[in-house]
Amino acid sequence: MALLSKKNKPSQKAYAVVTGAGSGIGRSFALELAKRGGDVICADIDLSSAQETVDLIQSMTSTSAYAVHCDVGLKESVHALAEQAEQLLGYPVTLLINNAGVGLGGKFDEVSLKDWQWCMHVNLWGVIHGCHYFVPKFKQQGFGAIINVASAAGYTAAPEMTAYNVTKSSVLALSETLASELHAYNIAVNVLCPTLVPTNIMKNGRLPSRYSGLADKLLMNHAFTTSDAVVKKTLNRLDAGKLYTIPQPDAKLFWWMKRASPSLYVKLLGLGYPLFNQITK
């Protein structure tokens, strides 16, 4: 097994596991990896959608792809995925993409603890479980790569997204910590932090009724990219040894504003919040 290097890029001819591969960014990751010569495990809680992704891969490439059911919030399910992946691929996994996620919005005091647990179950524990079961394998084989899909929500602190923000900021912190801890083991880490991308996460999320139609309007008018473009940029940055992928202009603007003056940034959000309330009434 060759060590990861500039001559052996993580996204090229990878043996990959992608969670949430049944749609959106996850499907785009699976398709792009197949185009780059990789064999892909398409894991999703919806097995039929994962199979659709596999069918797409098989219709356009000669690489291997497999659909596997996985509830990333259940440690037993992710453990089984880790064991099954190597058996199906016939080779140790070289790239893990923790992508599965759900959307949750609403005022802090209106979001139930049950919904908090649901969001944490998928968005945070799903990533923790993936890293927990694959990192030891990467260490043992002497190389590997991880992409964790977070969100610009992890640092923008947007109102009425508390639970979602908390999960994504945790994924960001986890990724940064793993990058420093795993560097000596030749394990690359990249964390993806996009703003709006046309996917089903908002449509299938748990959002207040007053948000009805808002998600579609935002995606139609303010999505500066596509899931395919985001994925290509992320894989290229992983190959280049970069930790962060912040793909859109607005995501980069928020990133630098927050770092330039954190207190002023949060104050401005608070001043602008009444306008958001007017829009969603």
Language-model features and meaning:
Residues 15, 22-23:
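Conserved glycine-rich cofactor-binding loop
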Residues 38-52:
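Conserved glycine-rich Rossmann-like NAD(P)H-binding loop of the short-chain dehydrogenase/reductase
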Residues 47-48, 69-80, 113:
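The beta1-alpha1 cofactor-binding region of Rossmann-like NAD(H)/NADP(H)-dependent oxidoreductases
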Residues 107-108, 112-117:
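Substrate-binding pocket helix/loop in short-chain dehydrogenase/reductase
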Residues 131, 167:
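Active-site helix of classical SDR
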Residues 151:
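Residue(s) in the substrate-gating loop at a strand-loop-helix junction
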Residues 184-249:
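SDR active-site lid
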